[in-house]
Amino acid sequence: ANSALYEYNAENKLIKATVQNGSLVIEESYTYDYEGNRTSKTTHRSDGVTEYVKYLNDNSSLTNVLAEIDENGTAKCVYTIGADLVSQERNGRTSFYLYDGHGSVVGLANENGAVTDTYSYDAFGNLLKSTGSTENCYRYCGEQFDETTGLYYLRARYMDTSTGRFISQDSYAGSIFDPISLHKYLY
């Protein structure tokens, strides 16, 4: 992105990101539920393209997205959750997630077990190389990557891999017995 402008609500949640890439301006707005979990994303592009995604979440422990729903109420993508994200069903095709020891998605496999897509990252989550064309937003550390903003959504806040930092402060106050936890922008 050439430039980005972020807007936050009173709870320090990102509610709007405006990104300019050359002459193209993209504005994304986000909504959250009462527990602070992201429930929707609306994208408006200066070329007239608009997209809406509602996230159907499982909030039983660590919030996981079960489905992405479009503006007509149609499921664009349905996820299967186990200990980690197991698979996605998108456009009538099922892809299974392959992970490394860090929990990052390093590949996708089809129903026959053939690897269709691969991903490799640097230490901060920047994508170094990818193969394949399957639509997939789950990548580094198994978290959602937003192509428009270049940010990872880690449920509580967003991380910019180009700087290796979060773009907002941690809501956790930290502990004087664990001094590094007092740094509001660390993971």
PLM features: what roles do these ranges have?
Residues K76, Y153-L154, S181-L182:
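A conserved catalytic-core signature of glycosyltransferases
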Residues R90-A156, S162:
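A motif-centric feature for acidic-aromatic and gly/ser/thr-rich catalytic loops and repeats
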Residues S175-I180:
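Short linker/helix segments within small regulatory modules
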Residues A1-A4, K16-G22, S40-D47, V65-G73, ...:
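Beta-turn initiation residues at beta-strand->coil junctions
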Residues A10, Q20-G22, Y34, S46, ...:
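Short, ordered coil/turn segments that flank beta-strands lining enzyme active or ligand-binding pockets
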